[in-house]
């Protein structure tokens, strides 16, 4: 489990983006919450920070992790290792871009600073139909070298040139419809056909695909 947590979230300058994919009800949110809490417990680096960006305004990690608005992110970061950010739904894209750029500013101003930025509903901000903002391009393409790890949470694998070449792991709780099987194989090298029946027959199980090594592994639901 320890290696899985590091593969998911650790900003070590080696691992690239993690995509955690699944439709509502597939177990994705539970997995996120439990693995993030476990990672925070095991990682005692005082210079580490987690920023969870949740446009749906649903994620809570614990009773002490009170969600904040955009103007409270920096203050909360100074005091707490984890910050849950609920962007204003009427200005969501601008606020999310600001939050990402703020993390890069903090990295420049604080020696040893390391962070994981989890973006829920990532398909809203980066997809094949929409060019990524400068902030998201910076996060996806240069975050690793700055000690900032990107974790994209989406309903399905994100098809975007900005993300395809900078993804280390796909963690899939539901598999895409047949229409997208070819794209997934072409862009990430994953053939999902052998895993459709096992995933669908065991609720909350998931497929872990190492994009760099081209290796896939099925996992049973995590135990708490």
Task: Describe these PLM feature segments.
Residues 58-65, 75-79, 160-165:
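Short loop/helix-cap segments at secondary-structure boundaries that form the rim of catalytic
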Residues 21-72:
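Walker A/P-loop NTP-binding active-site region of P-loop NTPases
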Residues 46-48, 80, 146-148, 165-169, ...:
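Short glycine-/polar-rich loops that comprise or flank the Walker A/P-loop
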């Amino acid at each position: 489990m320890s290696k899985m947590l590091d593969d998911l979230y650790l900003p070590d300058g080696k691992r690239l983006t993690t995509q955690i994919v699944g439709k509502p009800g597939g177990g994705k949110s539970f997995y996120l919450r439990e693995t993030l809490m476990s990672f925070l417990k095991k990682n005692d680096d005082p210079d580490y920070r987690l920023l969870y960006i949740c446009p749906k305004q649903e994620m809570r990690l614990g009773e002490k992790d009170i969600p904040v608005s955009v103007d409270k992110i920096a203050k909360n970061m100074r005091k707490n290792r984890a910050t849950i950010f609920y962007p204003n739904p009427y200005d969501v894209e601008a606020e999310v871009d600001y939050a990402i750029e703020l993390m890069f500013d903090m990295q420049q101003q604080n020696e040893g600073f390391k962070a994981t930025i989890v973006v829920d509903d990532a398909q809203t901000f980066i997809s094949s139909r929409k060019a990524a903002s400068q902030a998201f391009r910076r996060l996806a393409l240069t975050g690793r070298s700055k000690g900032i790890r990107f974790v994209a949470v989406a309903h399905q694998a994100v098809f975007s040139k900005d993300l395809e070449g900078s993804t280390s792991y796909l963690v899939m709780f539901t598999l895409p419809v047949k229409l997208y099987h070819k794209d997934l194989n072409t862009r990430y090298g994953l053939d999902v056909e052998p895993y459709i029946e096992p995933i669908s027959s065991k609720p909350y199980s998931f497929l872990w695909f190492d994009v760099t090594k081209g290796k896939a592994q099925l996992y049973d639901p995590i135990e708490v």
